[in-house]
Amino acid sequence: MSQTTYPLKPVVPFIKVTQDRAVLEIQRGCIRGCRFCQAGMVYRPTRPRDINMLKETARAMLKNTGHEEITLSSLSSSDYNELEEIVTFLIDEFHTQGVNISLPSLRIDAFSLDVMSKVQDVRKSSLTFAPEAGTQRMRNVINKGLTEDDILNGAGQAFEGGWTKVKLYFMLGLPTETQEDMEGIAVLADKVARRYYEIPKDQRNGKCQITASSSFFVPKPFSPLQWATMQPMEEYIRRAGIVQEAFRNQLNRKSLRYNWHTAEVTVLEGVFARGDRKVGKVLEEAYRLGCIYDAWDEYFDYDKWLQAFENTGVDMDCLLYTSDA
């Protein structure tokens, strides 16, 4: 990996964009084995980049772009053995320039308070963790390798280090999921908030904000769950409603927020994840019908996509709800 070419002069947009930052890939692949994850399977083996190469690349990218933020990118940043060294280097090198460091892929069981405390010294931000499921049974099914104690201990370290905002990512519609698993998302988020309020009041930084987000499970090819059946769109919406109601019943509900991915978009993700060359015709037909900027909610028109499938004769249900598509 250290011998491969890395873009030192990425294009800088002349307008304000969402991902307005330099991106530094610190390693490729993942040492974990989550059963839903395509990237963790197809990018094996894990290949870390040389620390000296990363330092020179970061220095060049920030000089050439003028960005005020750099993201240390990988499938699991906290599994990079020299993470603390690269973070310390970036802080020492660019502290006076106010460069923010983003660590988007942290495992809560590998949370390093020392590393994150250094990051906070530059500019405070929220922390994001991905328990993926609300109960231990469901996490075992997907081989997440996280216990509730891991989650609460990691969150506790973050709170004691001064953070008050935590984002938690979950998935709905996983194989064998029960109502207890769905409601467990709200219960776990509440336990995380409760962990914050266990800190003496004079040592807290005001109230905490726990934001839980759920996407809907899409079976990915080349993953162990590639042949699992997707749930109908209406079922995804029903399950999100169950979780939302569970959040309303939690003790610390004022500190909790919940949102979920658009079910219609999930259906399309499932089609393109599991489809063969025939879905290329659907994509072209959707474009001809005017589906151009559909990544933005205000432009997304599900009816046009349904029309595209009808016009091309591609059966969505066959791709989504059977294992022999």
Predicted regions and their residues:
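Canonical Radical SAM [4Fe-4S] cluster-binding loop centered on the CxxxCxxC motif
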Residues: I15-N52
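Conserved small/polar residues in nucleotide/adenosyl-binding loops
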Residues: Y321-A325
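Sequence-structural signature of the catalytic-core scaffold of metal-dependent phosphohydrolases
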Residues: I292-G313
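Short glycine-enriched, charge-decorated loop/helix-capping segments at active-site entrances
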Residues: M41, V141-L146, Q226-P232
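Radical SAM enzyme [4Fe-4S]-AdoMet core and its adjacent flexible, acidic
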Residues: S214-W260, V265-D294
